Amino acid sequence: MKVSVLITLAVLGVMFVWASAAELEERGSDQRDSPAWLKSMERIFQSEERECRKMFGGCSVDSDCCAHLGCKPTLKYCAWDLTFP
């Protein structure tokens, strides 16, 4: 009886170590791939956005404001231009 319990515990321990190693290997490959993916996504988003130079006032044209903001000519501030991404 004691021998079968010890064998069962040993088998469970080996299975735990094997499953943990497989999970670490899988997670490691995700971490190796993710920096390249993040850099490519960063380039995509940077190419679509314009710089925010006059967000809180002092704008003269729409290009001074952030994306989806337009320059209001009366008070010279940036406000939503009613567009969606």
Swiss-Prot record:
The keyword Secreted applies. Residues 22-51 form a propeptide. Keywords: Disulfide bond, Ion channel impairing toxin, Knottin, Secreted, Signal, Toxin. The presence of a 'disulfide through disulfide knot' structurally defines this protein as a knottin. SUPFAM superfamilies: omega toxin-like. Belongs to the neurotoxin 10 (Hwtx-1) family. 28 (Jztx-11) subfamily. Disulfide bonds join C52-C66, C59-C71, C65-C78. Expressed by the venom gland. The keyword Secreted applies. It comes from the Eukaryota. It is found in: Secreted. Pfam families: Toxin_12 (PF07740). InterPro entries: Huwentoxin-1. Probable ion channel inhibitor. This is Kappa-theraphotoxin-Cg1d. One of its GO terms (cellular component) is extracellular region. One of its GO terms (molecular function) is ion channel inhibitor activity.
